């Protein structure tokens, strides 16, 4: 008797569903990051961290463009909540920046820490399925994750952990991000 051994845990249909889920949620996340930094820069453009925020925003614009290309390539529609996420993220950016540079950087730390963990979870899922099939996506997500974690470190270097009520602020922001991720994975 012969046994067929498969490395991948997914059928073709479930593999496509996995790719769609990852691209849809990551597009939403990169859209959110783009809007957060736009909101922060609207408030802090002339400040000591204005150029730092601008640099991170430029990188997020490139990340969003990458996700737009992946969505088009794999025919993945954006989450229907994109307009809501866009407004909420811009408001988060403005609101965190109104707390000063520490507030803006606390927001960066909270978001980028969670997104780094989220990218790691996705990478593990793709590796468990089939590294060869997902080679291109693994390379892209690894690069994006590394750049997001660099943003996290930038937030730490620029006193984000000194923001008023840092722990509460971080918890609120990460809870909101987790909710957005859960929604975008499905819709």
Curated annotation (Swiss-Prot):
Fe cation 2 binds at residues 60, 112, 148, 151. Its cofactor is Fe cation. Fe cation 1 binds at residues 30, 60, 63, 148. Pfam families: COQ7 (PF03232). SUPFAM superfamilies: Ferritin-like. Its main location: mitochondrion. It is an enzyme of class 1 (oxidoreductase). Its EC number is 1.14.13.253. Disruption phenotype: Worms show deregulation timing of a wide range of physiological processes. This leads to an average lengthening of the worm's early cell cycles, the embryonic and postembryonic development, and the period of rhythmic adult behaviors. It comes from the Eukaryota. One of its GO terms (molecular function) is 3-demethoxyubiquinone 3-hydroxylase (NADH) activity. It catalyses: a 5-methoxy-2-methyl-3-(all-trans-polyprenyl)benzoquinone + NADH + O2 = a 3-demethylubiquinone + NAD(+) + H2O. Binds 2 iron ions per subunit. GO terms for biological process: adult behavior; cellular respiration; determination of adult lifespan; negative regulation of gene expression; negative regulation of protein phosphorylation; negative regulation of transcription by RNA polymerase II; oxidative phosphorylation; positive regulation of behavior. Signal peptide: none annotated. Component of a multi-subunit COQ enzyme complex. This is NADPH-dependent 3-demethoxyubiquinone 3-hydroxylase, mitochondrial. It comes from Caenorhabditis elegans. The gene is clk-1.
């Amino acid at each position: 008797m012969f046994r067929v051994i498969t490395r991948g845990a997914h059928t073709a249909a479930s593999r496509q569903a996995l790719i769609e889920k990852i691209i849809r949620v990551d597009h939403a996340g990169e859209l959110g990051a783009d809007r957060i930094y736009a909101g922060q820069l609207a408030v802090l453009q002339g400040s000591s961290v204005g150029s730092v925020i601008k640099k991170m925003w430029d990188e997020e614009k490139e990340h969003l463009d990458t996700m737009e290309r992946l969505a088009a390539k794999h025919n993945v529609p954006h989450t229907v909540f994109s307009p809501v996420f866009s407004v909420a993220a811009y408001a988060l950016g403005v609101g965190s920046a109104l707390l000063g540079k520490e507030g803006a950087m606390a927001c960066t730390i909270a978001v980028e820490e969670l997104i780094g963990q989220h990218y790691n979870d996705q990478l593990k899922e793709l590796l468990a399925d089939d590294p060869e099939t997902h080679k291109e996506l693994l390379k892209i997500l690894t690069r994006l994750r590394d750049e997001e974690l660099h943003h996290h470190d930038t937030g730490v270097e620029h006193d984000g952990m000194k923001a008023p009520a840092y722990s509460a602020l971080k918890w609120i922001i990460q809870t909101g991000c987790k909710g957005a991720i859960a929604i975008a994975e499905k819709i």
